[in-house]
UniProtKB/Swiss-Prot annotation:
Protein name: Adenine deaminase
Keyword Hydrolase: yes
Organism phylogeny: Bacteria, Pseudomonadati, Pseudomonadota, Alphaproteobacteria, Hyphomicrobiales
Organism whose genome encodes this protein: Methylobacterium nodulans (strain LMG 21967 / CNCM I-2342 / ORS 2060)
Keyword Disulfide bond: no
Origin: domain of life: Bacteria
Cofactor(s) required, per the database record: Mn(2+)
Amino acid sequence: MPAEIARRIAQGAGREPADLVIRGARLLDLVTGELVPTDIAVCGEVVVGTYGEYEGARVIEAASRIAVPGFIDTHLHIESSLITPHEFDRCVLPHGVTTAIWDPHELANVLGTAAFDYALQASTETAMDIRVQLSSCVPATDLESAGARIEAADLLPYRDHPRSLGIAEFMNFPGVVQADPGCLAKLAAFAGRHVDGHAPLLSGSGLNAYAAAGIRTDHEATGAAEALEKIRKGMTVLIREGSVSKDLAALAPLLTVATSPFLAFCTDDRNPLDIAEEGHLDHLIRTAIRLGVPPLAAYRAASLSAATAFGLTDRGMIAPGRRADIVLLDDLEACAVARVIAGGRAVEEALFAGRARTPAPGRGSVKAAPVAAEDFRIPGADGAETSVIGVVPGRIITEHRRLELPAANGCAGCDLDQDVVKVAVIARHGRPGMGRGFVQGFGLRRGAIASSVGHDSHNLCVVGADDADMAVAINRLIALQGGFVVAAGGTVLAELALPIAGLMSDLPFEAVRDALHPLREAARTLGCTLPEPFLQVAFLPLPVIPHLKITDRGLVDVDRMRLLG
């Protein structure tokens, strides 16, 4: 190490040629907002010189391109990209995302601590710097059947792992506010480490209590007033723009040069089609700027503010002594990524070739018995008021609606005129269980859509206008050992297998992307009006997001944290 420090000193002083020089860049100064012409000298994986001219063993001609720090995704579930972390690395790093903070919460709900073992090992095999936050709430609640339970004692062996930052989104915010002993044990075990938050709509004294527990970041703010209260109370708000949860438009007015130290970006859940068609954090940055956010504020949020919030003090700026994560842009406002340097290495296809790939665990994890059409019958009287999950497009928050539905032979049925169809969740972790209900807002006129991605316990979820097609879709999911299925007329119209824990494919990114096109098209032929139907299905079972959800145990009134009778 002393020899490496000596090399950095010599190269920074100009006494030796730098390992790498990026020549003729215009550096975005995150302190002043200026675009400053300069070379950038790199020794190993560290920047050693800026604001001058340097000689290097290797030279990249920037040709007046704009140099900005590498982007940091502050909270995501790589599983939601449906691909392995190695494929995620290959396809997202070229978008300028040089650091990702991964909560393997989805895998953990299926596999328990084996998910941490896999995530931590895989994070050593990627060119992107992937840091892991340990999933704090597995299961999220006791209102569903999960594949695992993780307590404070299970987290402790991973606390001091060099790839671990702390614990991930603390979803049991009522438990924190009420000083639940299990929550306190986890918070105490990770005192002094980063504790990430998850507190939708929490405010006032409840938010005071939550922040006082040492929780410093939150990505669940969906409105500017909510986000402002959180940053005023010392939290960093992670502005989320995923494939379903789209909060950027609502929060963009809050992101100014003055507030940018307290705001960062995250994707949470982003699928391969959106990555391919729109991008990743580069999409968030250009969208924010288009919405009126000053470019300096947007790029600060994407780098320096993110690094500061998570204690990653070795990155976030292009400055001597900082990690050489550098993005060269053709256009600042369009965030047009031309070239990426990650840890001092040029991002090229050769960078990913020949890397070790630890096999992903979790095959054979879908343990559910076949179902029949009659299993989806819901008792009810004609004209009786029924609780219905109301989908809010672009949100994972749902409404608790009370609607009159038709019934025949003692069973309530779909009402297509009101855009109401059935939804069911089937237990998949080896124990029987099935919750049934109704949902409004999918636009389905026929058929069924099913998914083994069902936050957070990842039981099987199906939305459908026909009981027989719902059975076809679920039974095909079981045969595939997880995935997405669209069925109508008694046949499968489109499918994608996700055999890794029922969550991820072992195929290349491009193959998964291409398989999603016919799935979306098949959903549209059923009448589905939602732009991302599969992730929308996946969030219907999430009983920690208001207001009405469904699990394998039935409908959940999230506001009261209880099952409906």
